Amino acid sequence: MATASSLFLASPVATAPTARARSTPSASPARPSLRLRRPSTLAAAAVQAEHQPAVAAAPKPPALPFRVGHGFDLHRLEPGLPLIIGGIDIPHDRGCDAHSDGDVLLHCVVDAILGALGLPDIGQIFPDSDPRWKGADSSVFMREAVKLMHEAGYELGNLDATLILQKPKISPFKETIRSNLCDLLGADPSVVNLKAKTHEKVDSLGENRSIAAHTVVLLMRK
């Protein structure tokens, strides 16, 4: 666990249910409605983060022109839980069993950015032993990682992410997920790529018992 107390936000992230925007349905074929997670408490959490930097005492990394980071995450899928991917509520009969909202895509993107900066991983900065992050919206973690990236003098060069899950099919939701990911990163869509793969019914991923994601990021000196 990171030792500096300033690694953490000042107060718990609220988890009360909030309204979610629905995507516009296509003409044909009919697709399940999507819900963009925008908690009403997110603005308050962002204000808290502004007043309490996450790694105030951490030295800036060497001024390399480029830095590369890799992120990986995996969560069990359990019946009756929400399935959140890239900040989007995906219709499914199973969801991620996790301390926060279990957003496997955002978690691995955060880890990739932190890794590129040479900082502790998401589990150290936002540990699952801390009740403040119980049910937390993962966009809070994303915004903090992006803030640290800019404070270190870097910007996103490009990002390539791969989701691995057997069900549901992600293709109907992929562009909505990618668009929200671009918004959280403050990045142009041309530098953010998202792919989805099944696991050919092999092991827990292929048996619809888990979901995983890999992400590689390239950061460029401003």
Curated annotation (Swiss-Prot):
MF-aspect GO terms: 2-C-methyl-D-erythritol 2,4-cyclodiphosphate synthase activity; metal ion binding
CDD domains the UniProt entry points to: MECDP_synthase
Family to which the UniProt record says this protein belongs: Belongs to the IspF family.
Designated name of the protein: 2-C-methyl-D-erythritol 2,4-cyclodiphosphate synthase, chloroplastic
HAMAP family: IspF
Gene name of the record: ISPF
InterPro entries, sorted: MECDP_synthase, MECDP_synthase_CS, MECDP_synthase_sf
Record-marked site positions (Transition state stabilizer): 99, 198
